[in-house]
Each structure stands twice: as structure tokens, then as C-alpha cells.
Amino acid sequence: MRSARLGRLLWMLFITEIQAATELPEEKYILAEGETLNVNCPVTVGVYSNSRKAWQKLNRNGKFQTLAITERVSGQVSKVQVGKIFLTDEPSEGMLHVQMTNVQAEDSGLYRCVIYQPPKDPIILFYPVRLVVTNYSSGTPASAETPTQSCSPTTTLPPTTTTNRHRPRPRTVRTVTQFLTDFTTSLSSPGLKVTLTNVTDITRDTEISLILPAVCGLLSKSLVFIVLFVVTRMSFTP
């Protein structure tokens, strides 16, 4: 009886550890009401170029709800607008651009961009995005961690679009992805025409880096479970 209870306890612990190991880190964006969220999701060129992409949000029931879906257009740029959500799929560049304008407090939550392929499960393209919308104005800092003091008069500036106001994490993969995002944004000014040649390699490295930690975590948890199981069997063997 004791061995059966211990076995069930070990199994529950094993399942919990597996779920924790397979969870992806989040990208956090902190915006004020009325600002615009911009997210660039890398797509593997030649693999998912012609696949439909979607922007989803986690609802209160714990399930992701599809907010907008792109059309399947072979080799061409696809643009879709659903309310204040804009999706731009650029197959040649291997990038899905997501834009949400005039964000409000109720827009706060967890989002993700995926390959949309029902009835199959969607394929996550990028880190889940955690959006936090505050009620601060555009001229007020969204966080109290970096206060500024000034004795001179201040000038109120018109609202601006904030594309990437989040705290960077010390991860190599995220640094590469963020570099690609900032580089793409900085080259989006009118009159500039630049061809990116290494997008495929970066997106492939991103996918490998997403899968490799989950596999390593699963293998490590399996090894722990096997050792615990052997020790349990030996302790109850007469």
C-alpha cells in the first residue's frame, strides 16, 4: 500500500516537472493606454512561408482564442486587419509583423503568433508575449524603477508609438531575436531599401534554441524519475 502511494506521488511529481520544463519564457511589453504594440515573429523561410499565420490571446478559460488569421498567398505579402489588429505576412523575409493600435487596459494578457493549421495543433513561432497596459499617459514613465529628476520645465510631447518597451533577458537566443527585431524596425523608414540575407539562419537557430531546452529538460526529468523508481523498488524489496 505504501509503495503504491509513493509510486503515485512520484508519478505526479514527474508530470509536473515535465510541464514546467516545456514551458517557454515570455517576452514582456509594458505600454500605456493609447499606444501601439508591435511584434515581429520570425518564420522559417521555405517551410512555413505559404502557411497561414494567426495572432492568439489566452482567454479566461485557459485556452487560446484566435484574433486574426492571414490568408494563404504563395510568395506574396499578405495583409489582414481585424479591428485594431494588423497582420502582415512577408514570406520572402520570413517575418510576421503584428500590430495592435490603441491598446487599453482590457487588452492586457498573454498573446502568441502561431502557424494556423486546424485541426492540428498550432505551431508557436515566437516567445509568448505578455502585454501589460497601464493607465499612464505617454509622457509619464510606465515603470517607477527608473525615475528621472529635473529642475527645468518639461515639455509635453505628442503620443508616440512604443515598439519594444520591455526588460531584456540575458539569453543568447533572445538577444539574436531582439537584434533582428530592432534591425528590421530601424530599416522601415521611407526611402531605405535593404535586403536581409541571413534571416533564414537566424530563424532556424531560434527554432532549434526553442526545442533544445525542452528536450534537455524532458531527458533530465526522465533520468530523475528512473533513479527514484529504482531506489523505491530497492527499498521495498525483501
Curated annotation (Swiss-Prot):
Residues 141-169 are annotated as: Disordered. Disulfide bonds join 41-113. Residues 21-210 are extracellular. InterPro entries: Ig-like_dom (IPR007110), Ig-like_dom_sf (IPR036179), Ig-like_fold (IPR013783), Ig_sub (IPR003599), Ig_V-set (IPR013106). It is a single-pass type I membrane protein. Pfam families: V-set (PF07686). The keyword Signal applies. Keywords: Adaptive immunity, Cell membrane, Disulfide bond, Glycoprotein, Immunity, Immunoglobulin domain, Innate immunity, Membrane, Receptor, Signal, Transmembrane, Transmembrane helix. One of its GO terms (biological process) is innate immune response. Residues 146-163 have a biased composition (Low complexity). Residues 21-129 form the Ig-like V-type domain. Residues 1-20 form the signal peptide. The keyword Glycoprotein applies. Monomer. Homomultimer; when activated. Interacts with TYROBP/DAP12. Interacts with TLR4. This is Triggering receptor expressed on myeloid cells 1. It comes from Sus scrofa (Pig).
